[in-house]
């Protein structure tokens, strides 16, 4: 009886042993799959409800990363089960090489996706900005698909500003700086940039301008990278745009002949848009540009999103700096025309 059982066991097929290289490859797939799922979870967990208030493209990328991660984990699991069922038929060498190249490219792209998700994590708005998002008797705040609009309630504003936030900065973080402009009678539209990067939609300002046809005098502007893109838009559309408001920013090229009124507001302690960069930008801006220094101000004082890596050390308070930024910004719009009555 025992002899018969032993003979039967000996006749059973033995699953092939996986090579160390194949085992390592499968483990790397598992790590990649986990990373693709974990990165979006980390972004959401560390930013609260920030993602749902940005342009939909950010949520789409996070969702794509989760789906890709689950698919990678499924491939790793199915591959292990197939190995247990026995060896696969050998493929022609050329076909195997092509498959290997395709797999390698796919894995590289997925690694880039996981890294991009981490890098695209927005700087969340802090309490002062969130408090400025409440509508009241003087300003209506409209949170729409492509932007947040600050609309004066007292009469129809005829002068407006389309504003592009800095790279990866929560659009809501601009509220405490932009709302006072609406309280002064100007329409202000803060753009929700795809992925939080203004360069991804350089003509987005045109859509906002078209949505508010009651406004006949427009300025565009922005903070940091947002200001760079706004500068390019103003230079290319100076027949439609009357003013340009730069917050810790400068143009990417020569726009000195553009027919726009420019105001450049900058902080003397800014570690990113440094005073030297502001000085160098003078040659690229119209001769009539008004430069307004915020003594002791830093890059992150132009919105409310906490500290920013690489920034300088402030020599003034955020409240004092923002009061000066608001005053200079209202002055820039005052130069263009009159606010609503």
Where do the protein language model's features map onto the residues?
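Membrane-embedded alpha-helical segments of integral membrane proteins
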Residues: 23-83
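Internal/C-terminal transmembrane anchor helices
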Residues: 89-121
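Short beta-strand element of the alpha/beta-hydrolase
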Residues: 151-152, 157-167
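Gly/Ala-rich beta-loop-alpha elbow adjacent to hydrolase catalytic centers
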Residues: 164, 221-230
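Conserved alpha/beta-hydrolase
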Residues: 178-198
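Short glycine-enriched nucleophile-adjacent loop
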Residues: 227-238, 244
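Short beta-strand/loop motif that positions the catalytic acidic residue
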Residues: 258, 262-270
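Short alpha-helix in the alpha/beta-hydrolase fold that links the catalytic acid
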Residues: 273-284
């Amino acid at each position: 009886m025992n002899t018969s059982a032993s003979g039967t066991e000996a006749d059973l097929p033995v699953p092939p042993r996986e090579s160390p290289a194949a085992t390592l490859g499968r483990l790397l797939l598992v790590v990649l799959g986990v990373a693709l799922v974990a990165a979006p979870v980390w972004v959401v967990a560390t930013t609260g409800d920030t993602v749902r208030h940005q342009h939909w493209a950010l949520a789409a990328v996070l969702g794509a990363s989760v789906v890709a991660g689950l698919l990678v984990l499924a491939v790793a699991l199915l591959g292990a089960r197939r190995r247990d069922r026995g060896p696969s038929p050998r493929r022609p060498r050329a076909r195997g090489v092509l498959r290997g190249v395709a797999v390698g490219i796919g894995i590289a792209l997925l690694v880039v996706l996981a890294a991009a998700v981490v890098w695209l994590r927005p700087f969340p708005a802090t309490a002062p900005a969130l408090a400025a998002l409440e509508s009241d008797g003087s300003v209506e705040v409209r949170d729409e698909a492509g932007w947040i609009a600050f609309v004066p309630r007292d009469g129809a504003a005829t002068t407006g500003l389309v504003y592009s936030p800095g790279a990866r900065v929560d659009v809501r973080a601009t509220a405490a700086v932009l709302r006072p402009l609406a309280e002064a009678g100007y329409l202000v539209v803060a753009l929700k940039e795809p992925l939080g990067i203004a360069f991804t939609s350089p003509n987005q300002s045109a859509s906002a301008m078209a949505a508010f046809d009651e406004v006949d005098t427009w300025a565009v502007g922005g903070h940091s990278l947002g200001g760079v893109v706004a500068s390019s838009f103003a230079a290319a559309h100076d027949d439609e745009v009357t003013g340009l408001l730069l917050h810790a920013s400068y143009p990417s090229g020569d726009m000195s002949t553009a027919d726009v009124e420019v105001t450049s507001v900058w902080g003397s302690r800014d570690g990113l848009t440094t005073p030297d960069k502001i000085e160098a930008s003078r040659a690229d801006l119209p001769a009539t540009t008004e430069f307004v220094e915020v003594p002791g101000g830093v890059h992150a004082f132009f919105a409310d999103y906490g500290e920013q890596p690489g920034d300088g050390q402030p020599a003034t308070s955020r409240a004092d700096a923002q009061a000066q930024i608001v005053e200079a910004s209202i002055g820039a719009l005052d130069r263009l025309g009159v606010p609503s009555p």
